[in-house]
């Protein structure tokens, strides 16, 4: 009996140990599941509350300017193609992760975040600065998430001379460049369209005060500088370029208005060694409305492609105008079908 009792005791011990092993395995599995759920929740929270200053970015995506060309970090020429938002204060809902991902699917590799300075609810005229900067942070985050570049655009327009709000610009770009210092996918556009008689000397003076503030935080980032006459007079910049590396010069066109003369001005400036970036264009007339001219637009695209000139199309909105990409009757902010697109939207999707 003692022999059998010993055997029974041993069997009981084996069963207890096995039970404990199963319990420990179940606890480990449960903890792993909880850890996975926590990670997903944390990731979701981080996605909804972008923190660009701490985000992980692809440091191989850095850009530099070599001669008149935009190049990758290895010095090979690149051509960015993408889309500009309309005013962030007026059409903020398009800055969302699904929309930016969809534009990437169209073939876009850059998104321009247009923040008006002087117009209604502009950054310098009563707009909510914290909300506008938060939209820029989100736009940069979503662009980085989709391996795209983001242009932070100080959208000078009705004030004409960027020196009007120079102090605000200096503060803004100092803050933004500090926040995005580790992100090589951020490009700074420091004055959209100097106009109303503003000279290149005035723009030059302004840029000489703003660029060093960006360089203090982000020494290698690409900076785009607007040119006089609604960013058409690149020829004047070509005769007196700024004394900084990795600086490009904006040329803007609207294909139904601007034809061979402006195209020739672009190619001549490039031939003189000026790095040109078409940071805004449309295929209608210069008002942003009116008739579409696809024939002229296609000639422009051919000219830009032949010189590897990067270009950004205006605009991501459903505003009732020819330059909007989305029909005025469409209230979606992502998941667009071809039926939701305007003629310019359909054209751009084909081109990209």
Predicted regions, residues:
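N-terminal carbohydrate-binding accessory modules
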Residues: 45-110, 126, 346, 350
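Extracellular glycoside hydrolase catalytic/binding regions
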Residues: 62, 87, 92, 166-187, ...
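C-terminal motif of bacterial Sec signal peptides marking the signal peptidase cleavage site
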Residues: 16-19
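Aromatic-lined substrate-binding rim segments of carbohydrate-active enzymes
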Residues: 96-159, 166-171, 175, 215-217, ...
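N-terminal, intrinsically disordered, polar/charged segments of Gram-positive cell-envelope systems
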Residues: 25-56
């Amino acid at each position: 009996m003692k022999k059998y009792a010993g055997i029974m005791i041993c069997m009981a011990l084996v069963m207890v140990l096995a039970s404990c092993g199963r319990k420990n395995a179940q606890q480990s599995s449960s903890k792993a599941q909880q850890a996975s759920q926590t990670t997903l929740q944390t990731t979701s929270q981080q996605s909804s509350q972008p923190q660009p200053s701490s985000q992980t970015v692809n440091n191989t995506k850095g850009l530099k300017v070599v001669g008149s060309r935009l190049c990758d970090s290895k010095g090979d020429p690149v051509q960015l193609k993408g889309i500009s938002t309309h005013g962030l204060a007026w059409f903020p809902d398009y800055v969302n992760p699904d929309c930016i991902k969809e534009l990437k699917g169209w073939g876009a590799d850059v998104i321009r975040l247009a923040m008006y300075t002087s117009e209604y609810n502009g950054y310098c005229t009563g707009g909510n600065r914290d909300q506008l900067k938060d939209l820029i942070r989100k736009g940069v985050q979503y662009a980085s998430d989709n391996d795209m570049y983001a242009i932070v655009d100080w959208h000078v327009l009705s004030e004409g001379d960027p020196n009007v709000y120079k102090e605000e610009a200096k503060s803004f770009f100092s803050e933004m460049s500090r926040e995005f210092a580790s992100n090589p996918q951020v490009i700074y556009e420091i004055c959209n369209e100097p106009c109303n008689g503003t000279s290149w000397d005035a723009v030059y003076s302004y840029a000489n005060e703003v660029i060093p503030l960006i360089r203090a935080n982000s020494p290698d980032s690409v900076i785009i500088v607007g040119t006089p006459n609604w960013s058409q007079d690149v020829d004047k910049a070509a005769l007196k370029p700024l004394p900084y590396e990795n600086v490009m010069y904006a040329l803007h066109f609207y294909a139904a208005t601007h034809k061979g003369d402006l195209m020739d001005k672009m190619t001549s400036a490039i031939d003189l060694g000026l790095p040109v970036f078409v940071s805004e264009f449309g295929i209608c007339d210069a008002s942003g409305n009116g008739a579409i001219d696809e024939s002229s637009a296609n000639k422009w695209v051919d000219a830009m492609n032949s010189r590897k000139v990067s270009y950004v199309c205006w605009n991501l909105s459903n505003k009732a105008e020819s330059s909007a990409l989305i029909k005025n009757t469409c209230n979606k902010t992502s998941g667009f079908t071809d039926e939701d697109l305007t003629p310019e939207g359909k054209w751009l999707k084909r081109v990209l």
